[in-house]
């Protein structure tokens, strides 16, 4: 199994706009990080975890030519705002399986209303095949077994 961290930056990316901290001013290439997304390759399957706001740039940089599926961990902007950029893959290969939990699907339908309730197609819409996952209930993509875990993220209690 190969994991390719396409982005490991914060929600604003690194460097952050207008930030004068040591990291953001650094010339070290390790301090230039895109927002979070991971590419998993195993057994001939390619899975993307989260479509970050930087997904287009990440896909071009990593030469992503095909995806078997996308998994959405949660619907913070930095994890889903690249969803529209799967369209070129849809144009070539058709609809794509997207895996997310029920709460994420509610948010995705609200955030991307134009995909789920289209009024104007324009340059095309992302073509999704929705799959709802349940925490602690394994599912498979090809021969890859995945067990979604609930993680507290963002503001802690």
What do these predicted regions represent?
Residues 1-157:
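Binuclear metal-dependent hydrolase catalytic cores
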């Amino acid at each position: 199994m190969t994991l390719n961290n396409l982005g490991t930056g914060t929600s604003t990316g690194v460097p952050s706009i207008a930030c004068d901290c040591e990291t953001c001013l650094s010339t070290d290439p390790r301090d230039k990080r895109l927002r979070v997304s991971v590419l998993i390759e195993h057994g001939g399957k390619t899975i993307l975890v989260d479509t970050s706001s930087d997904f287009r740039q990440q896909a071009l940089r990593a030469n992503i030519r095909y995806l078997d599926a996308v998994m959405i961990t949660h619907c913070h902007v930095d994890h889903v705002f690249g969803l529209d950029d799967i369209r070129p893959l849809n144009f070539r290969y058709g609809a794509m399986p997207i895996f997310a939990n029920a709460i994420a699907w509610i948010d995705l339908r609200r955030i991307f209303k134009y995909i789920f309730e289209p009024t104007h197609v324009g340059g095309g819409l992302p073509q999704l095949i929705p799959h709802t996952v349940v925490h602690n209930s394994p599912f498979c993509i090809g021969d890859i077994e995945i067990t979604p875990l609930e993680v507290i993220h963002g503001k802690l209690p």
